[in-house]
A protein has these predicted regions:
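N-terminal membrane-targeting/pre-transmembrane regions
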Residues: 1-60
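Short amphipathic beta-strand/extended segments with alternating polar/hydrophobic composition
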Residues: 43-49, 111-117, 149-157
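Hydrophobic alpha-helical transmembrane segments
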Residues: 59-73
Length: 185
């Protein structure tokens, strides 16, 4: 299993890491993981910020009920932010089986999506206008059995830049080219 890790910056200028792994020689599949680089720093920042907030409220001689309301609301907001933040996104490509797309959130919550191999029509890097700027997204073209075409966006939460997407695209295109060669023979 060959593995490589490359560091990039996403469209919001946050550091991300792309890890690509080759899976087996018989299947010739691969896995791509894009994750935020400073995951530990946010937890460390939150652990120092919370006690500082408690001490500040105590020294301001706030009413005790206001102290508990501020504390509870701060805890609720902190938990919500931790719960909703995407930690990493993974795309696993196994030829003749399909593409599994996994998004991991805080508190080990995951969402999985699967695209069957027979329904994959292609992969493209799509140019999108978003809030007065142009961003690039990696998209899988899916045709269902009734020949309706739909687009499935990959890495929509970590939002890697074009240079990162091109690396993933080239590997996916190699695998999909093998699919078309095998289906013709």
């Amino acid at each position: 299993m060959a593995s490589s890790t490359t560091e990039f910056v996403n469209i919001n200028a946050k550091p991300i890491t792309l890890t690509s792994k080759k899976i087996g020689t018989a299947l010739d599949g691969c896995q791509f993981t894009v994750k935020y680089k400073n995951e530990v720093k946010s937890k460390l920042y939150l652990s120092f910020l919370l006690p500082a907030f408690f001490i500040l409220l105590r020294h301001l001689n706030c009413d005790i009920s206001a102290y508990y309301i501020f504390t509870a609301s701060f805890l609720a907001i902190s938990i919500y932010i931790e719960y909703c933040n995407v930690r990493k996104e993974t795309v696993l490509i196994i030829p003749f089986v399909g593409i599994q797309y996994k998004t991991e959130y805080g508190f080990k919550m995951e969402k999985n999506h699967f695209i069957h191999w027979q329904t994959i029509d292609g992969v493209i890097i799509n140019e999108v206008i978003h809030m007065h700027s142009i961003i690039y997204i990696l998209t899988v073209i899916v045709k269902d059995y009734s020949q309706k075409t739909s687009l499935v966006t990959l890495f929509k939460n970590t939002k890697p830049r074009l240079k990162c997407l091109e690396i993933i695209y080239q590997e996916m295109e190699k695998i999909l080219d093998n699919k078309t060669k095998d289906s013709k023979s």
